[in-house]
C-alpha cells in the first residue's frame, strides 16, 4: 500500500516501490546495496523523486516484498517515503557548501527521525511537507513547504509556515 511505499501501476500488472533515504542522504554502504540490487533484479526504470526518495517501477509483487525486506536490512525505509508522511527535504549541498554558516545536516536528520518515530502517534495533516535549506541553493524550496526552515547568516533559521512567501 501507499503507506509503505508501494503502489500499483496502471493496469495492476506491476507496481512501484519507493525508497526513503533520510533527508535524501545516501550512505556509501546503501549506494553499494543499491548498485547490487539494480543488477540483481535487472531494474531498468528508476528515478529520484522531488521528496529525495528513489522509485523503482515495473516490479512484480514478489520482488516488491523481497525488496522491502532487503531495504530494511540496509537502513532504507519504505514507510515515510511519500503519501501522508513524506521525507523531509534538505539542501543537496548541505555540509559541503563553503557559503554555509554551518552544516544543517544534524537538524534535518533530527526532524526526519522524529517524524518517522512519531508518525503513528501524532496527527499531522495529509501530505504535510517539510524542508530545511542551507540558505543558498534553495533546492528544498523551504519557503513553499507546509513548514520550512531557511538558514540565515546569523546562525538562526527563518521559519516559513503554510507555504508562505516571507519570514
Please identify what each model-predicted range represents.
Residues 1-7:
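Intrinsically disordered, low-complexity polar/charged tails and linkers
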Residues 10-18, 165-167:
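Gly-rich Lys/Arg/Thr-decorated short loops/hinges at beta-loop-alpha junctions or inter-strand turns
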Residues 14-157:
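Small-residue-enriched alpha-helical segments and adjacent helix-cap loops
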Residues 156-167:
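A structural signal for small-residue-enriched, beta-sheet-centric alpha/beta enzyme cores
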